[in-house]
From Swiss-Prot:
Component of the ribosome, a large ribonucleoprotein complex responsible for the synthesis of proteins in the cell. The small ribosomal subunit (SSU) binds messenger RNAs (mRNAs) and translates the encoded message by selecting cognate aminoacyl-transfer RNA (tRNA) molecules. The large subunit (LSU) contains the ribosomal catalytic site termed the peptidyl transferase center (PTC), which catalyzes the formation of peptide bonds, thereby polymerizing the amino acids delivered by tRNAs into a polypeptide chain. GO terms for molecular function: structural constituent of ribosome. The lineage of its organism: Eukaryota, Fungi, Dikarya, Ascomycota, Taphrinomycotina. Residues 95-104 have a biased composition (Acidic residues). Residues 83-110 are annotated as: Disordered. PANTHER family: 60S ACIDIC RIBOSOMAL PROTEIN FAMILY MEMBER (PTHR21141), LARGE RIBOSOMAL SUBUNIT PROTEIN P2 (PTHR21141:SF5). HAMAP family: Ribosomal_L12_arch. Belongs to the eukaryotic ribosomal protein P1/P2 family. Component of the large ribosomal subunit (LSU). Mature yeast ribosomes consist of a small (40S) and a large (60S) subunit. The 40S small subunit contains 1 molecule of ribosomal RNA (18S rRNA) and at least 33 different proteins. The large 60S subunit contains 3 rRNA molecules (25S, 5.8S and 5S rRNA) and at least 46 different proteins. The acidic ribosomal P-proteins form the stalk structure of the 60S subunit. They are organized as a pentameric complex in which uL10/P0 interacts with 2 heterodimers of P1 and P2 proteins. Coiled coil: none annotated. It is found in: Cytoplasm. One of its GO terms (biological process) is cytoplasmic translational elongation. This is Large ribosomal subunit protein P2C. Yeasts contain 4 individual small ribosomal A proteins (RPA) which can be classified into two couples of similar but not identical sequences. Each couple is distinctly related to one of the two A proteins present in multicellular organisms.
């Protein structure tokens, strides 16, 4: 993900076809070591492709993915009673909050 983010930053900045050294340079400015194999694989995959078209195609694919998280949470409540399901949901929310607070939002490129 960090390699793709660096690639996109370079393309938004006006570099139409970023090289491996460009991507590695962007990553090194924020203290991230890069793996040249992964950088080369990314460049190979994106070579000759329009970024805007790739983003549009990705958005279309994401739109078709069902997001049934709410339906799955409602099913145990209907089958097993509201009290245990509510207690379980509260535990899950507390656990998710702990996990999301661990990096304080600074783990963008980790």
């Amino acid at each position: 993900m960090k390699y793709l983010a660096a690639y996109l930053l370079l393309t938004v900045g006006g570099k139409n076809s970023p090289s491996a050294s460009d991507i590695e340079s962007v990553l090194s400015t924020v203290g991230i070591e890069s793996e040249s194999e992964r950088v080369e694989a990314l460049i190979k995959e994106l070579d000759g492709k329009d970024i805007d078209e790739l983003i549009a195609a990705g958005n279309e694919k994401l739109a078709t993915v069902p997001s049934g998280g709410a339906a799955a949470a409602a099913a145990p409540a209907a089958a097993g009673g509201a009290a245990p399901a509510a207690e379980e949901a509260a535990k899950e929310e507390a656990k998710e909050e702990e996990e999301s607070d661990e990096d304080m939002g600074f783990g963008l490129f980790d």
